[in-house]
């Protein structure tokens, strides 16, 4: 068997989802059969036939660096990336930054910012929180990844 030097190795895991705010919490809740689907608390469902959602409840998201400049989805990804880097015991060395890439999967981008802008006519600079590309850009910026930074957007399965 020949050695392939062009490979990707997953060395750390990070997770924030409706049944946990870390890999361990999510795994333990999954083993217990915990469902994250509940009556929504963050979306106004008046006039809607659906009131259930798999919401992520995490009160630590505003601890992200420059959190006020990010949409909620970017904060979730920054938190998961932080856990993955810690799990891998990895800090990006200065001379390796161009070799570290961030590739995210999402199909909507900063939808909370889009909705706030539509409903309230928020500040013009808030449009920078909206694009799908903002998610991977924020993770790369905060952790110093200067390699390829992109987002895969191909329907709801993009994040799986």
What feature does the model see in each segment?
Residues 151-155:
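Short beta->alpha junction loops
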Residues 159:
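Short conserved active-site loop signatures built around small residues
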């Amino acid at each position: 068997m020949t050695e392939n030097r062009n490979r990707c190795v997953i060395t750390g895991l990070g997770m924030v989802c409706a049944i946990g705010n870390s890999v361990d919490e999510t795994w333990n809740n999954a083993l217990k059969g915990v469902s994250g689907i509940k009556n929504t608390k963050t979306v106004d469902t008046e006039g809607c036939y659906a009131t259930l959602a798999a919401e992520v409840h995490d009160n630590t998201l505003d601890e992200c660096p420059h959190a006020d400049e990010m949409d909620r989805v970017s904060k979730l990804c920054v938190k998961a990336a932080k856990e993955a880097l810690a799990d891998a015991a990895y800090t990006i060395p200065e001379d390796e930054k161009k070799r570290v890439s961030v590739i995210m999967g999402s199909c909507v981008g900063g939808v909370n910012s889009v909705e706030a802008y539509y409903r309230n006519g928020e500040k013009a600079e808030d449009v920078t929180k909206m694009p799908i590309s903002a998610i991977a850009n924020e993770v790369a910026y905060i952790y110093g990844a200067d390699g390829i930074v992109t987002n895969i957007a191909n329907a709801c399965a993009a994040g799986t």
